[in-house]
Amino acid sequence: MRIRRLALVLTLAGTVTASCTGSTPAVSPRPSSSSTAVTGGLSVVPARSDPLCKAVPVHRPRNVGPAGSLPSVFARVAQQVEQIRSLTYMRPVRAQAVTRAAMNQLMHDKAGSQEPRQSAARTSKAWATIGVIPRGTDLYKAVSDFDASQVLGFYDPETRRLVFIGTNSPGPFQRFTLSHELTHALDDQHFDLTHLDRLQSCRDDEQGAYISLAEGDAVVTSVLWARQDLSAQELTQVEQAAGSGPPPPASVPPFLVKLMEFPYEAGPAFIETLLQQGGPGAIDDAFRHPPVSTEQVLHPERYPSDRPVTVEVPNAASKLGRRWKEIEIEQVGEEWLQLLFGLHLSSVNAAANSDHWGGGQYRAWSDGAHTAVVMDTAWDSHQASARFAQGMRQWLGNRSTATVLQVGPALVRVLFASDRQTITLLRRIMG
């Protein structure tokens, strides 16, 4: 769980209150308690059993080392966070102030193995084919560059380590950052934030919803803390410090910036609604029964009853050819689609085209030189699906390497390819 500078600018500027074809897919009604699969033609390999969708193992060490005692200034912030959240720490928190250079090194070390690089390369190929990032984007480097310029602190639920940029005698802005991370630590002790790591891969939208819950709580709590503890002059200092940092580097595509900032923008509004409905206890209940889609975060009135259907794009690797391999599966939610539309359309049209989403997924394949992507999305009604299909056609413009298909009353399939030869093949197989 990380706090980013752009998030602080957005927070402080606002107000916080108390994916030859087979048969046409069949769309099941929106369930109220469990997900229903929506599948297309060809032989279906469920995403949840796909090798690309392995759950990330969580190894929380039994002994994470002595916590020690917090410096008095840190302890005071922790006590105030307890008061705002109506919770108490069950064990001491290890908090460490570090330099920017040390923070970047810690994050580099945590990235670790080659798997994140390989996964990012596959995602980059799929996203470039869809058209949300430029071709040739090094997504791993883009994320690293973004974090190196924007991350101000983090709390690691696996090691229970809290780190922020600052000193042991923190000023107002550093204490503001500390209050955010201390909220994560408090939530972790009561609700176990490693839940995020245990979510199976390929459940990207559900992960985004959970991150929005956690970051939303931390943002709201830190703002309430600032308003209670800081003087008017200190609040001005915090706002100035938040706005004085560097913008994201040019290596970071706009789509990625928006994707990474989403939890800090939509999450607080979701938390505000919970507070208005039931106070801090409603936030606690949300951690026990988290939102399962970014739709629920964007539309709190749809939480918790409006659950998504499970859309599974057929695995077309064998139909594409002997050299083709599956490279990526991603759950596509309202947030992702709204950000896609926002690259070329107005924010109003982006929101309208992605509203009343019911479920979605894309799958991507490559033979090394060519890439194919199929995105299936389910909608609450034919009207919503038709609006999405029309919006996608507008978004694609005169692109010759993509096709939008209305394949059911409330199901839309979009085909993307890296080149004309591949889109012709994909249309024959999946069109």
Residue ranges, per PLM feature:
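C-terminal motif of bacterial Sec signal peptides marking the signal peptidase cleavage site
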Residues: 16-19
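Short pre-active-site segment immediately N-terminal to the catalytic Zn-binding motif
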Residues: 162-179, 206-209
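Pan-zinc metallopeptidase signature
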Residues: 79, 251-370, 376
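Bacterial signal peptide processing site
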Residues: 21-23
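Active-site recognition of the HExxH zinc-binding catalytic motif
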Residues: 81, 176-193, 218-219, 271
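Post-HExxH zinc-binding segment in Zn-dependent metallohydrolases
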Residues: 188-194, 198-238
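C-terminal soluble interaction/assembly domains
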Residues: 358-431
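Catalytic zinc-binding patch centered on the HExxH motif and its immediate surroundings
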Residues: 104-121, 136-162
